[in-house]
């Protein structure tokens, strides 16, 4: 009998792809073959997957983007993707199909339903996304990264936590260097696609900090491509040492070296912050579906590991005060780091692996 095959289907943002990568790494170590089904947008985030993972770009679409003609073609594109997935599964039958959300996961999950293959989904947020909500009643297991998670009536969830990449686990519980009179690192991350509001507010907020903090501060700021130039210029005008990029490939290292993190509260970002264990200021994305980013942040905030600032209340003066409070109180910052670490779920990947292997055993 050949090695079992896991088919991972994930959509085109880091929030979907990073947990998928964590599962792929774990299953490869267990001797499984792994394929990733995603679209061209998702493939941009697949560079960190193990090299033995075969990446299949699928045809999918969303009604959320494009004009009337593009929307009219959505069903045809999805149907084409489903037909292609069915044909692929008949050639090389997956032992388990797992979806991590996003429209590009529709073809593989639909094919798994049609062929009655073992199938499951993982939802990273405290509220199911549209695609996961559609498939939740049609899979054998619904794994939840945040608890409690709002689930459709009659659907039971299994709390696994959010898997993180091996690079994050390698930095888990890395010693926290408290703020002090020496070089300090501040990391600003806006999710896999950056955050304009952070680019608008953070540079000015940092520029308002007391000189004794600014003299030692180094900044790594993730920004949208169209914002990189103006954010870089804002830091330059203030005489601040800042590295501004659209995407940092070494976020785990940067988080482990940070005295403070300013971030959106996407599920992957919250998981990374808690497992590495760093004080954070979280600014939930106000337009997130069902306000799921506020739900994601709640655990760290209630654990007194993070400060929550609603987007509507974010301004340079208020943010600057919060940054200064953390960076000028080393004992309090150390306790925030400890609280974050206690909230983390470093075994989330193993819990998810258990569900995959359980479904595979039931099939044999």
From Swiss-Prot:
Q: How does it sit in the membrane?
A: Peripheral membrane protein
**Keywords on this record?**
Cell cycle, Cell division, Cell inner membrane, Cell membrane, Cell shape, Cell wall biogenesis/degradation, Glycosyltransferase, Membrane, Peptidoglycan synthesis, Transferase
Q: In which pathway does it act?
A: Cell wall biogenesis; peptidoglycan biosynthesis
List this protein's GO terms for biological process: carbohydrate metabolic process; cell division; cell wall organization; lipid glycosylation; peptidoglycan biosynthetic process; regulation of cell shape
Q: Which GO terms describe its molecular function?
A: UDP-N-acetyl-D-glucosamine:N-acetylmuramoyl-L-alanyl-D-glutamyl-meso-2,6-diaminopimelyl-D-alanyl-D-alanine-diphosphoundecaprenol 4-beta-N-acetylglucosaminlytransferase activity; undecaprenyldiphospho-muramoylpentapeptide beta-N-acetylglucosaminyltransferase activity
Q: Name one GO cellular component term.
A: plasma membrane
Catalyses which reaction?
A: di-trans,octa-cis-undecaprenyl diphospho-N-acetyl-alpha-D-muramoyl-L-alanyl-D-glutamyl-meso-2,6-diaminopimeloyl-D-alanyl-D-alanine + UDP-N-acetyl-alpha-D-glucosamine = di-trans,octa-cis-undecaprenyl diphospho-[N-acetyl-alpha-D-glucosaminyl-(1->4)]-N-acetyl-alpha-D-muramoyl-L-alanyl-D-glutamyl-meso-2,6-diaminopimeloyl-D-alanyl-D-alanine + UDP + H(+)
Which PANTHER family does its entry note?
GLYCOSYLTRANSFERASE (PTHR21015:SF22), UDP-N-ACETYLGLUCOSAMINE--N-ACETYLMURAMYL-(PENTAPEPTIDE) PYROPHOSPHORYL-UNDECAPRENOL N-ACETYLGLUCOSAMINE TRANSFERASE 1 (PTHR21015)
Record-linked SUPFAM superfamilies: UDP-Glycosyltransferase/glycogen phosphorylase
Q: Which Pfam families match?
A: Glyco_tran_28_C, Glyco_transf_28
Task: Show the InterPro entries listed in the entry.
Answer: GlcNAc_MurG, Glyco_trans_28_C, GlycoTrans_28_N
The organism of origin for this protein: Cereibacter sphaeroides (strain ATCC 17029 / ATH 2.4.9) (Rhodobacter sphaeroides)
Binding-site list for UDP-N-acetyl-alpha-D-glucosamine: 13-15, 125, 165, 192, 293
Q: Where is the protein situated, by its record's location annotation?
A: Cell inner membrane
Enzyme Commission code(s) on record = 2.4.1.227
The UniProt entry, under Gene3D superfamilies, shows: Glycogen Phosphorylase B (3.40.50.2000)
Record family assignment = Belongs to the glycosyltransferase 28 family. MurG subfamily.
Q: What is this protein's function per UniProt? A: Cell wall formation. Catalyzes the transfer of a GlcNAc subunit on undecaprenyl-pyrophosphoryl-MurNAc-pentapeptide (lipid intermediate I) to form undecaprenyl-pyrophosphoryl-MurNAc-(pentapeptide)GlcNAc (lipid intermediate II).
Give the protein name, as stated in the record. UDP-N-acetylglucosamine--N-acetylmuramyl-(pentapeptide) pyrophosphoryl-undecaprenol N-acetylglucosamine transferase
**EC class of this enzyme?**
transferase
Classification from the root reads: Bacteria, Pseudomonadati, Pseudomonadota, Alphaproteobacteria, Rhodobacterales
